[in-house]
């Protein structure tokens, strides 16, 4: 052991499953494989998936990641991450891969930010399952006015919408009602009604001659066409007689 380089000694101290044999080789006590005293080969082996799977879970300190990663209550053989709401296998390489991932780092930074501001932390996965309006209310730090999360207009808005009027678009005299006396007596209302009928009568007088002229024009055209046909047929007969 004293003959080994300093960097190789430090590496073996950090990996108790690698031991120096009498043949001056490095042996892995997990699978019995032997390696030469080469630091690069040992680093390559320890970074591989086989070594991570062989390492017993009992020697790994899972409590160092509490309270974010705890034992699952639904699945005793697995762990549960409170920040990402995901289950993890009780294996060191699974936990290490999760805590070094982008999802966990993003959730951890958000959790620390909420702790500093004094706001309750809500995981992103839980926010995605909530309705959109509920997420907005939670982000503002208040609860929704409606219990079922649906929007409903207030009474003042309903009253304002129901009082629609056209008086602001047209003159006011168009909306004045006639008095009972004007309706019974022959006042201005009868005169307007007479004028209305007079206008219709004049329209009828103008339209009637026009219809008669059209009829005359149509009748003259048929007579003229009949005369032309009669003249042609007579001319042909005269030519045949000759």
From Swiss-Prot:
Segments of this protein annotated with the region Disordered: 126-242
Annotated Basic residues bias: 224-242
Coiled coil location: none
InterPro entries referenced in this protein's UniProt entry, alphabetically: Surf2
Compositionally skewed regions (Acidic residues) per UniProt: 156-166, 190-206
Composition bias type Basic and acidic residues, residue spans: 130-140
Biased composition (Polar residues): 144-153
Highest taxon above the source species: Eukaryota
Similarity field: Belongs to the SURF2 family.
Name of the molecule in the record: Surfeit locus protein 2
């Amino acid at each position: 052991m004293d003959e080994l380089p300093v960097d190789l000694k430090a590496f073996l101290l950090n990996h108790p499953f690698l031991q120096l044999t009498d043949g001056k080789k490095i042996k892995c006590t997990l699978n019995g494989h032997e390696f030469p005293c080469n630091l690069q080969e040992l680093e390559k082996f320890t970074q591989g998936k086989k070594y991570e799977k062989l390492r017993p879970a009992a020697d790994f300190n899972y409590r160092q990641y509490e309270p974010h990663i705890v034992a699952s209550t639904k699945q005793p053989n697995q762990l549960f991450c409170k920040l990402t709401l995901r289950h993890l296998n009780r294996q060191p390489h699974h936990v290490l891969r999760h805590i070094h991932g982008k999802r966990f780092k993003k959730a951890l930074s958000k959790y620390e930010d909420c702790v500093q501001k004094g706001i309750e932390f809500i995981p992103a996965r839980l926010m995605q399952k909530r309705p959109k309006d509920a997420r907005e209310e939670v982000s503002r730090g208040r609860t929704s006015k409606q219990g079922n999360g649906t929007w409903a207009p207030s009474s003042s808005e309903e009253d304002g919408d129901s009082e629609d009027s056209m008086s602001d678009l047209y003159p006011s005299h168009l909306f004045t009602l006639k008095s009972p006396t004007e309706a019974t007596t022959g006042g201005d209302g009868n005169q307007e009604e007479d004028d209305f009928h007079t206008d219709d009568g004049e329209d009828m007088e103008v339209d009637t001659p026009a219809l008669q002229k059209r009829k005359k024009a149509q009748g003259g055209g048929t007579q003229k066409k009949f005369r032309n046909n009669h003249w042609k047929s007579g001319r042909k007969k005269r030519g045949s007689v000759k």
